Amino acid sequence: MLQDESSRSLPRSALIRRRLSLFLQSHALMYSFLWSESAKKSLLNEVFSALLGYDHTLWNTLLPERPTIDASFLLRRAQGHSEGDEYRHGTCESKCGHIFRKGEVFYRCKTCSVDSNSALCVKCFRATSHKDHETSFTVSAGSGGCCDCGNAAAWIGDVSCKIHSHEEDATISNDMIDEIPEKLENSIQTTIDCVLDFVLDVFSCSPENLKKMPTLESILQDEKTSRLSENKYGDIDDSCNMYSLVLWNDEKHSFKQFYEQITTALELPNNVFGKKMANIINDIGRACIVTETNIKELLKIGQKLAQINLAVSIRSMRDIFREESCAVLLEWLADIAGSSICGKRNYFSSVICKELVRPWNCGLHNSDLTFRLSLRSLALPEIVAIDSPDIFLNEDHINSSGPSDTSSHMLETDESSIHSRHWYPSNSLPDVLSYASRVRFDYFFLYDLKLWKSLRYKLQELYLGYFITQPGFKEIMGARIAISYRRLAELFLLLDREPEHSVIFFSMQIFTVADVAKLLVTEYDFLTTINATLYTFFTYKKLNTPNYVDQHAMIRTDSAAFHSRRYIHIFHHIQFMLSIPCVAEIVREDLKFLKQYADFFNLFQGMCPYTRAVSQHVEWENDSWMYVLNVSLQVAKLCRHVGNVFMELNTNKLANAINYLISLILYPKARNESWTNTESLTTGITVDERGNSKLIEYDIALQPVSFHHPLHWLLVYLLSFYVERDNYKLLWTQLDLLAVTDHPLRVCAWLSQMRAKLWIRNGTTLRDQAHHYRNLSFHEYTFDLDVLLLQLTLTYGDPDAILPSFISRFQLEDQMYGRFFVPHKHYDVSQVTIMMEEFLLLLISIVCNTAVLDHWDITRRIEYGIAHILCFRPLPYSEITKRTCEHLLEHKQFESTLKKVATFRNAEGINDSGSFTLKDEYFDYVDPFNIHYSRNQREEAENILRRRYSKQHSKHLESVVYEEYHPILHSNITIPILQSDSFVGILWHTIVYAYIYPYDQGKLEGLVNTALHACLLVLMSEKGSEPIFSKKICENRFPVVEGLQEYCNSPDVTLFSVLCQMKNHRNFVYVKEKISLIMKILKSEVPLLYEPVYAETLSISSSKIVQSLSDAEQQEQHLAKVRMAKERQARIMEQFRMQQNKFLENHALFEASDCEMDEADEFSVTSSVSTKLFLDPPIDTCLLCQEELKDKRPYGTLVFVLRSSVLRLFPADDANYVSEVLDIPDSLDHEIQERPFGLAGKRKKVLDSTEAYDYDNYYYEKKGNELHQLKDSFNGFPPDQLDRGLHATGCGHFMHIDCFKNHIATVTLATRANPYRNHPHNLSMKEFLCPLCKALCNTIFPILWRPKEEINFQEAGVLTAPLKNWLVSKTFSFNKDLNQQLLDIETSPSEHTQSYNLNLLDVLQHTLRDSLKDIYTLNTGADNSSDNVEENADNLFQSSVLDHVHFKSVVNNEVPADERLAISDDIFELYRRLDDVIDLNSSLYSDDFIPVNGKLHNVVKLFSYSLCQVEASTRGHIKCSSIPADIWVHNLGKNQQVFLRILSESIKTYTLLCAHDSQKRIGGSIQEFEFISFCQQKRIFGRLLPSLDSPVTKSITDDRVEPLLVKDTFREFAEASVSGLLSCDESFHYLTQLYYTADIVRNLWILLSQRNSLLKCMESVEFEAFDYEQLKGFEHLVIQIWKSLRVDGAGLINFDCCTEDDLNNPHLLFTLYKLLERFSLIFLRKCALLWYCRYGVSFETQPNLNFQNSELSRLQTKMHIPGVIELSNHLCLTASSTEWSLIKHWCNFFTETGPLCDFPRAYYPGIYELVSLPYELDKVFELLLARRCSKCLTEPMEPAICLFCGKLLCFQSHCCSFNGIGECNLHMQQCASDIGIFLIVKKCAILYLNPPVGSFSVAPFLDAYGETDLGLRRGRSQYLSQKRYDETVRTMWLNGSIPSYIARQLDANPDTGGWETL
């Protein structure tokens, strides 16, 4: 910029200021008011240039050379700093200061911390020792906060952090620090000064209240007032006629609401632009939606956006541009604040801090008007300026001038007249200053609401990261916060759109520091400011003065103040301040604070009174009571905090404080005429006619009464502290205490009336309030204090004078003075009984709970509370905490006391929780009449105690009176209440009322029990002391009332006489034992009185009563005889029962033989001994009709066919997995103790043993490093190594076929009738739920087959003929070459065609006929003889086979018509449904999931895949019983065994139906059967069996047949067993040997092609003592296979194939042998399952083998299959054998056709594991710190980890969604395809997905007390339960149960679906 002549004389700093100011003013115009990356780049260049005084040679003070500054340039990064420096050795300092981001986890330690504000980041927490400490963690809501590691003021002792406590000298040596040139210092100060002023100039005109829509005039006015001043910025600020509409973020509207409203307002065709803007708004906090010159058009759009209350502003583009510039400038300040200059780290931040405490020099065009408008919004002057000397303050600050409004702080006369002096600042404070003393810092705080989300967060980072660490600046910040607090709180409470980002949360980080808090309270009267803020907020009174309140103001419970929950934070601020010891000391010594809180509490005194609805119900009930109750709870909590402050106050001062509160209660201040509640004004004492003083008359059943009396609650705290003093004196009269007690007494009586249902017409809201008032969250702050005040009054007053007032408030005068038959004006008879019982219960509670009076310490109170919680049953820790009072729970001794009182039992089962059981000795604390117990709990507690003492004293339960042994009164301080004449009179009238009143005695049982309990209470407590109460029972006489005269002949009687009469009364049998105990005690305590009064009782009682009393002894003897007779009868019945059982055992065989005879008739079984069937007839009934399942009606079992990707392929190229195969245990049919196994276990050990804070490279800026590090942390199985297929599973329930059809119709109708529900099933996929277990199903397998016996393999005998003989007899002679034999058959096809047709038809027809039950078949007549198989059949075979051969009908007309088989239509219909289900599941992902093959092809693959998955799911996880099964198959569940056999028979039947000649066609056809059979036989034998030779099969060329070595050998065997080799059922043992050999050859082929992997894993193999001579045959086999790889297959030779030298290495051969053994074990396990379910082989009857042997050896022995060595030696000895011919055929076939096929892949033989999780969930938090999603490159707010592959994903986040599909669903399609399992880390949940639905479950983590924590609401550290991980998540995945689990969850919780309901 060129300088004119006038500027040459200006100083350098002025020139810098002028140039920079002019640039900042003109910057927007330079870019036509359009913000861009270029504008940001030019701005950064300018401010860096200004920083250096436009002298670029000074760049060497910052960097070695001048950098190129672009829009992303950061000086801090250029200097080598990076994210995570606070953790990196060499760069971190002694303090961490890590700022918590939103969603980040931080920790608290109650044991170590000073208060609850102390926090540690996850890395520092992990690097410090907190063993056995009480810790918790919280997920940050983004409201600020930083790590306190290294902050000594935050911790009780030294918290040694391994990161920040290192001994390295992190300071820079003096040689590295250069002096900063003076001109550079000046330029830095000038630049920062100019930048700060510009930012404030711009934001001073920004809108603050966005709730009000702008108008045309206000927009134009805003444009004018926002112009910058020419005097300050050097040029005239031109107007701007372009305007932008800005949409702001809030926390009320969803992402969808935003983008849909944008689309609607702008009338866009789709949501693309709306979603883009919504993402920007969500990330940044605001976005410019549209720009226009037409303001009216913008207003029109804005009105549409505001229809759903979205926040909208419209400003000129110039101002929007400048606001964006200010955001960059603030980021720039944060950048340089963390940078160094000339080696000085904190120089920049120091300069910024100095400039922030200087006044703001306003630079607006109309500065006076604009500034006044700005101040009008502030409207609150500060209390006092900073006048203490500080490094940041100098004379320029004190003397500087700025805009001011000197009149704004003046007190108005009418206001000051209504203030009390205790709201004024103390005299020691300086005078209130004007606005001239405001500094820039104040405005940055006050303009917080004008900023958007990201900028607010950036400013808080600046405060916390750099300013708070400056020496002395924390106190300055605290002072400025104190000055602005009132306005900040008002903005937060009323206007803030994003309250979690408010600067008020940051402020709490400052003023809760002890030193700062003391300074603010003493110097700035900050506590008064907070108190006044809360006072004026609830009174809805806005004043221009800071700390003065209107004491005549009143609350309005219907105002917005009560509906907002934000006031809770202000309450917390006060509570935090009061919890600081130095602040508490100030408060208790200055009475003005007590008066302030008394004024505040007085606002709520008597709030929301109720008057009883007498004649009619309340018609309308609003919900305002909930808001009132929430406010009342916070007020009550504040009462506790305020009261606790005065705990240590001097006794005399405490008495003065109590006097003040009592006077305030007794003489309340006059209320406004609008105040309707007169209850608080109606208190006092009156004197009756006889001169007795009592409470004034007040009928709570007719007059108003309120729950809320916080002044009383506060008074109780002070009184309880006062009476604990040793030198206290009662300075208050009894009458004063009684008058003060009136309000709590009314509440107690009111609650009793509500329990008696007197207030039922007032509706449910009052009932709910009463419930909450006595509920746990409330009663410790309210109801308990009411009772305590009554207790103090009764204890320190005269009970005989006070109890009558209690009776009066309960309105029981008539009953307590003997007027029983006088009708009550309010109560009916039942209500009188309840009120009397409630009154007694209240008195008992007052007497028994003496914790305060006896000065119990906190430990004893905790023990007392826990005993009353755990006495009923063991409870988990979370339930205990829910039922424990908050002040006990928050105490540091709670957990240690809990462990002392109770015994902890760890969680055992997968659904169990750890629990605490109360130790026996602590049952002595239990009081069944605890006032918080319900009637049921009281009775249960009594029974528990009776059983306890019955056991201890060996007494009958009926005769135990627990009061005789159980200590309830732990103190004698309240006994005088029980010994008073008034209490004796209460008991007398209560018992007499129950005795004589003509009413249902059953309803009086509770009243009588309570009265007698009170008697026993005092009698037991008098033992060993003067028996005052005992004497009064016998001596005190009461007039005989009406009704008692028929029992007594005296004008007055004692209580003793009444009890004697009741003892043997038939209506009071239930209390006879208690009365007997009372008599016993009286006889022993007062024997001199007992005999006379007993004789008197006999003399005054009526004749009837006398007779009953004299006969008492005889009656007791009679009862004893009856009891003995009953015991004798019970013994006789038990003996008879034993004899009966013995008889049944001896004669059971007769019944069994009868049943067998019946079954023999039905099934033509000749033997009398039952034979085990292949499928036992089901004993269940039909799920729908509940009829028995018999052959009269077809039935079947429900099945679910689903897509699956469970099976894993073997990554042979990865040496880690090859090594894992070698580590597989020898036996997989036992539980593997090492969990997880293999690589997963090794990864888990690494995760658990490695401390992540040791990594210096924990933070990265390059994506590749992040992904690599994360992959190392959570590595799963490669997703490209999965084999996808179809899996069938069943729930085990049966249904009739016709019932099934009806059920499907019903489900369809019900689903379509409710289209808006997120249904658990998908009709388009033919899904439905099992009616019983709610498992997901989609078809039914009909049970069609005749009963057949299992094959006992041992008894049937093994086919011992050589394999060669069987092959020759079954196929052909191997004397000729294979190809030549095939050629011979092809040259003479006519010889075989006709015989084949007849043979095949006969075989299939007879097999099908023999297998089906009669009800499914019928013999057909001649009308069906023309059924033919269509010539044009399946499309798959039209082009491949039938083009060459004309296929004629296979039906021989010569076959008699009555021998042909016709099958029921239902069967074909059900199998067609199976076709449809398989097609739907196969074609859903047809491109990359399952190829669309023929119908039969997919069905047989379903069978083989299901068997493989079942076998894989049981590896190493079958828990053997005490008697191990002969084979692992028999360890499966019975239902699964049955289902597998049904599956096998169903697939076999499907194959037979494909070849059946009928028009009722299913999907498969005989042509497809021929093709599949041809391929299977050609692969295994090299040619066809004679029965399959036909023109069709002869036309199939070899290139259409895949080689055997390409396919999985077992799956080929399983598929052939139900299709191509159906005719070889009797030869399954030979087939097993054949496929077993092929499997060995195939696996050798695969392993030999992976040389590198073999050589790597060979290094880790421990070579045991082994005779290598035994490997000669194996070596020969390996060499032959290896040669096959090299012959005639140049294109097939793998570059990684083993060399000839490798094969000479015995170690390599041994490694190959061990690998083959592992593969052979898996193959034989699968074959055993196939034998069981397909061929019906049972191993159960075989003698148990030695289970010390390996499972492989046991399987080989059972199945008579040779081992690898035996087979190799056999092949070596017979080099020209048939087996070798087949092996050569398999190899040659592959080498010839291999280029057309994929390379063979083996299935993974290891134990299937999910991603390993560390033992501590804290470790997961640590490992995910600063990790970024690979898609959006941001740190996920809700990270999810795929438990298949371990990838980090964004959960429920729009950033990574596509077309409405979230990243978890998108990833699932690329990973497991069919289902998804994800760990949602910060919710401690498992997410299961089965598109399009999903559901949560609890993650397998438990806390230290054995409990799960879904959502991490309790915040306790979680630890992995590997057992739960295996038995829930892993087992559900392997069993294919996840879709059913999701369906059950959705069925139980009907909703509309989507993220909001997931």
UniProtKB/Swiss-Prot annotation:
PROSITE patterns: ZF_UBR (PS51157). It catalyses: S-ubiquitinyl-[E2 ubiquitin-conjugating enzyme]-L-cysteine + [acceptor protein]-L-lysine = [E2 ubiquitin-conjugating enzyme]-L-cysteine + N(6)-ubiquitinyl-[acceptor protein]-L-lysine. Pathway: Protein modification; protein ubiquitination. GO terms for molecular function: ubiquitin protein ligase activity; zinc ion binding. Keywords: Metal-binding, Transferase, Ubl conjugation pathway, Zinc, Zinc-finger. It is an enzyme of class 2 (transferase). InterPro entries: E3_ELL-like (IPR042065), E3_ligase_UBR-like_C (IPR044046), UBR1-like (IPR039164), UBR1-like_winged-helix (IPR055194), WH_DNA-bd_sf (IPR036390), Znf_UBR (IPR003126). GO terms for cellular component: cytoplasm; nucleus; ubiquitin ligase complex. Its EC number is 2.3.2.27. It comes from the Eukaryota. One of its GO terms (biological process) is positive regulation of flocculation. A zinc finger (RING-type) spans 1182-1334. A zinc finger (UBR-type) spans 94-166. SMART domains: ZnF_UBR1 (SM00396). PANTHER family: E3 UBIQUITIN-PROTEIN LIGASE UBR1, UBIQUITIN LIGASE E3 ALPHA-RELATED. Belongs to the E3 ubiquitin-protein ligase UBR1-like family. Ubiquitin ligase protein which is a component of the N-end rule pathway. Recognizes and binds to proteins bearing specific N-terminal residues that are destabilizing according to the N-end rule, leading to their ubiquitination and subsequent degradation. The RING-H2 zinc finger is an atypical RING finger with a His ligand in place of the fourth Cys of the classical motif. This is E3 ubiquitin-protein ligase ubr1. It comes from Schizosaccharomyces pombe (strain 972 / ATCC 24843).
